[in-house]
């Protein structure tokens, strides 16, 4: 049966945790580029695992040459940046194993990368991993229902509407 409630329901995007761990406020990240939202708003994760997954279905728009950051665009053009760890760019790719390629379509919760935390632990500022949404891609949409605290990969941690 057709439901008018669903027809008129505003489209929203469920954002899944990309990793097991703890979700924290973006303003609590130990880097002013992220905590002052210079690149955009979002949430950060303190990983308790080494596997990172896609927070929603979309297309991989960028993989930094150092394999520590991934851009993903949803079909609605909302785009996020998953930045794994802080100051990880200095590792020049060491400790990061990408599982996707630029231009590849991914499903929600599909494996993006594996990180060898034990190999890089003493060489990074923090393993805090911001998941930010590029302001130009939101176009009037906002991030809501942010879940902080313990999270599992694949669990809904925010809604964009």
Language model region names:
Residues 1-161:
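Contiguous, well-folded functional domains in the mature portion of proteins
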